[in-house]
Amino acid sequence: MSGSFDRYVSFKNCDWKVRSERVMARLQRHIDAAENPFWAYFAQKRTELREKQGLDDLRVLHNYLPTLRELLEDNGDLETLAMLEELEVNLM
């Protein structure tokens, strides 16, 4: 099999990339606030996973879904939590 494989072919017309970027943009607020050591770790792992393994934001979010969900609930960030859960239900 030659060429690249698009593992998101079933997500055609779902805007998964834009939706993932929106969630990451909202998570950036938590990363910048640095109120929990996890956020620095998450930012570092995101960079590593993207650069070294070629993973996109949807996959990075999926890798940390339970922790992200818990922290967003604890912080009362229900809007970002809803966006994350929508990604989970529709695209993960």
UniProtKB/Swiss-Prot annotation:
UniProt KW Coiled coil keyword: no
The record's Gene Ontology biological-process terms are: nitrogen fixation
What does the UniProt keyword field contain? Nitrogen fixation
Q: Does the entry feature the keyword Membrane, yes or no? A: no
HAMAP family per record: CowN (MF_02117)
NCBIfam families named among the record's database cross-references: N2Fix_CO_CowN
Q: Which family does it belong to?
A: Belongs to the CowN family.
Role summary: Is required to sustain N(2)-dependent growth in the presence of low levels of carbon monoxide (CO). Probably acts by protecting the N(2) fixation ability of the nitrogenase complex, which is inactivated in the presence of CO.
Name it: N(2)-fixation sustaining protein CowN
